[in-house]
Amino acid sequence: MRVFALLFLAFLASGASAIDISNRYRSPRNAERRVRKSTELIVLHTTEAPARSSLNKLCERGEAHYCVTEVGTVYRIIDRDRVAFHAGRSMWNGKEDVDEFSVGIECVGYHDKAMDMVQIRAIRDLVKELQKMYKIPDERVVCHSHVAYGAPNKWQKKNHRGRKRCGMLFAMPSVRTQLGLTRRPASDADVRAKRLVVGDDYLRRVLYGSVDTMKSSYPKTPSPTQGQEGGGLLSWLRGNAKKPDNKNPDAGKPQISAKNPPPPPPKLVPAP
């Protein structure tokens, strides 16, 4: 028993993981990545693509430390103490290049779609282990949207928060509760200090407001501001559809007339 206890203590001291982590997609980029000097954040991402293509890309480019699939499998990409290129143009509390002081976790899925509990549990267990290892409080477990920012462009004249909605669902109170996180960032220090401006008002409400569902106010029509409620053709179809009539199969279709023409198709504008 004493030998077992000593071995267990040695295991903890070594920083070895208690989670089953696969090295199948461990990146060949590890050898060229420098050791990270500090770890202040855990950044959660969504891949916005299926598992296999995401894992292949992450492995090839070394763009995350871990990837968690829909079935809860955890893959190591870049060793946790090395720099992974996951955050891109980023800022947190005045410090740029978040890659230099964070661990990045890619989660197979999409920023506006709920994840199954088997995946949520795997993310939760990994996050909790990393929190203990690096002494990271709940409010510094953030999503990519919290730290990414955009450079000035034709739609935004200043550096702005809103370049990415990646990982946005991990800011929602209900999802954070599932992850065992009791606190979240209270406000955007970089916007408050006027280092950045708000480029996506809907995203701001998700990250720091009370929005807790994608369905309640997610924009339906792309726009330069991205925070504006959309209506467009979908709303017109819903508003003009009548109840189905079994005797007349066309009765449920929206009624088009000179007085009630359908709206023109929305002009798609690239997001800032």
Regions found by a protein language model. Give the residues of each.
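Basic/polar, cationic surfaces and motifs that engage anionic cell-wall
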Residues: 19-22, 110-272
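Active-site-adjacent loop/helix surface patches within enzyme catalytic domains
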Residues: 18-137
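Hydrophobic h-region of N-terminal signal peptides that target proteins for export
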Residues: 8-17
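Sec-dependent signal peptide recognition
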Residues: 1-7
